From Swiss-Prot:
SUPFAM superfamilies xrefs: Actin-like ATPase domain, Heat shock protein 70kD (HSP70), peptide-binding domain
Any one GO molecular function term: protein folding chaperone
GO annotation, biological process: chaperone cofactor-dependent protein refolding; protein refolding
CDD domains named in the record: ASKHA_NBD_HSP70_HSPA14
Coiled-coil annotated residue ranges, if any: none
UniProt keyword terms in alphabetical order: ATP-binding, Chaperone, Cytoplasm, Nucleotide-binding
Known function: Component of the ribosome-associated complex (RAC), a complex involved in folding or maintaining nascent polypeptides in a folding-competent state. In the RAC complex, binds to the nascent polypeptide chain, while DNAJC2 stimulates its ATPase activity.
Family: Belongs to the heat shock protein 70 family.
Native organism: Bos taurus
Protein's recorded name: Heat shock 70 kDa protein 14
Quaternary structure note: Component of ribosome-associated complex (RAC), a heterodimer composed of Hsp70/DnaK-type chaperone HSPA14 and Hsp40/DnaJ-type chaperone DNAJC2.
GO cellular component terms given for this protein: cytoplasm; cytosol; nucleus; plasma membrane
Amino acid sequence: MAAIGVHLGCTSACVAVYKDGRADVVANDAGDRVTPAIVAYSKNEEVVGLAAKQSRIRNISNTVMKVKQILGRSSDDPQSRKYITESKCLVIEKNGKLLYEIDTGEEKKFVSPEDVARLIFSKMKETAHSVLGSDANDVVITVPFDFGEKQKSALGEAARAAGFNVLRLIHEPSAALLAYGIGQDSPTGKSNILVFKLGGTSLSISVMEVNSGIYRVLSTNTDNNIGGTHFTETLAQYLASEFQRSFRHDVRGNARAMMKLMNGADTAKHSLSTLGSANCFLDSLYEGQDFDCNVSRARFELLCSPLFNKCIEAIREVLEQSGFTADDINKVVLCGGSSRIPRLQQMIRDLFPAVELLNSIPPDEVIPIGAAIEAGILIGKESLSVEDALQIECSAKDILVKGVDESGANSFKVLFPSGTPLPARRQHTLQAPGSISSVCLELYESEGKNSAKVENKFAQVVLQDLDKKENGLRDILAVLTMKRDGSLHVTCTDQETGKCEAITIEVAS
């Protein structure tokens, strides 16, 4: 049987298939192995991928990009607010949901982020079917380690709406290790692996322990202010300054001209990973004036040196979190398209001079290949439960329970700190006045660091129809069990009457 692995990133998507014992990435109908995660809307059609990217200059207000950044998030989420400010396609709130407003001239329509993701998943399914046939729909989807339950759920729903049978979701660093066979090549050995992922909009670094074929995340960190787009923007700003120097026109305030410069900078950036220089020619950039500029790799490296330094500093921070030094790392895995940049690879080699740097698989294909391998494992062993097939993980975020302090203000108690090895079990006693007939236990995830932390509610358990007491308090015992696959089972029991309620929050599969 055949299976599929899909990685939907912020700027691109990629699909791999597992067949006859091996996993391979499938090229789309344009012949490209990676598809831009962009959807453009016109009067009569919805266009996905390269065609949408190429048309965005003339149809920018109806072109949706980076949908993954807003998927499953509410309007008051800090990341949503940042996205709404930066998006060229208008995002509004309607009936409590975020929607894209599409105006093609005849009428306005409103499109959900989940529906945009559905179209991208449909493109991935169509690409996979080109080599597997239409009967193959079993898929494993990758998710960032810091995705919350709502983001995972939205991603899974979009994939199912596209016609996929979602076997499960797998964390991106785990997929990267699977792609290189780490843990399978020496199942009895123990090693520490650093996974460096520099994607389109973010940098994610994880330190993972591999022991007897089992994966465990020791520490992880994501920085949404460093990504391939930031390198492109840096180069585009330089090109804008060169145009101004040559023609005395500042185009930084012209959205159309800057989009052209971004396209040119993106092409030049990719060329500079293999060439010493790249030519950037833009036809009629501004007021009919063509622009022709040559950029050397040395110039690009100088412009982006602050970003390179931030990447290396992020590695040092993750090592410190895990209590490791560079000498404790056995292998470094590179993934994400921007990890191709030669200067960045050299800086990582300098930091880990005695460590094997794994980059033989194209870095933007590593994660979907690992997902396809996981899908092959799952469908190949029908008697294997999803939990048993899953590499051991740790909790990605702090899991908290909401309470009230002595002053009456809301307070939060951390039950599962980020990084808790799974499986894990916690108990929490909730006290409530005996005079009320229902009690609600609210569960939250935290995002961000220190003063920037934000608590997001993702589940609740309600005990109803409790017998009222005139005096005193009632004790509600909550038992929370998080399995190896990240699913959470919660049981709340009234200690006096034995009445209980239970819920299970699945791992969005």
